[in-house]
Regions:
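N-terminal glycine-rich dinucleotide-binding loop that anchors FAD/FMN and/or NAD(P) in oxidoreductases
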Residues: 57-64
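Phosphate-binding loop of NTP-binding sites
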Residues: 30-33, 53, 66-70, 79-156
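Short beta->alpha linker loops
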Residues: 43-44, 63, 147-148
Length: 156
């Protein structure tokens, strides 16, 4: 198993296996808006993958080692991807840094100031409001929410 990745600020290119999930697509947007080249695989085109493509992120829908980039700094996968998925196997067997989505979220939060919203109801609404206020107050921010914010059309 790979050691946790550090050096998130030094990434040039990141590849996602399972990029079309709600959480993975948000992390892909995070890196993309930060100037990192992002691409990925998902088995099915969806509204989320089409939005990623429209923003300039390359997505392919066939698991095929011939289609994957070979000069990536980091590979991120979701546990929904089977361990024997051929792209995941290729990257692991060839010494690439391969990490789970949850590990990347940990690294992102460890390297920044965070405001966390907890509770039973209204977390996405409150997180969207706080993120919106900070973004428009001049402080700026990134926000990972539990659901898609209508005014931003994304979880990120």
């Amino acid at each position: 198993m790979n050691a946790p990745f550090r050096g998130i600020d030094k990434l040039n290119e990141v590849y996602f296996i399972g990029i079309g999930g709600i959480g993975m697509s948000a992390i892909a947007r995070f890196f993309h808006t930060g100037g990192v080249k992002v691409s990925g695989y998902d088995k099915t085109p969806t509204v989320l993958t089409k939005e990623l493509e429209a923003s300039g992120i390359a997505v392919h829908y066939t698991a095929n080692v011939e289609l994957i980039p070979k000069k990536v700094d980091l590979v991120i996968y979701t546990p929904a991807i089977p361990a024997e998925q051929e792209e995941l196997v290729y990257y692991r067997e060839n010494g690439y840094k391969v990490v789970k989505r949850s590990d990347v979220l940990q690294i992102i939060t460890e390297s920044s100031f965070n405001i966390c919203i907890a509770g039973t109801h209204g977390k996405t609404t409150i997180a969207t409001m706080v993120g919106h206020w900070l973004r428009h107050s001049g402080f700026g921010c990134n926000a990972f929410r539990g659901g898609i914010a209508v005014n931003y059309g994304t979880k990120f």
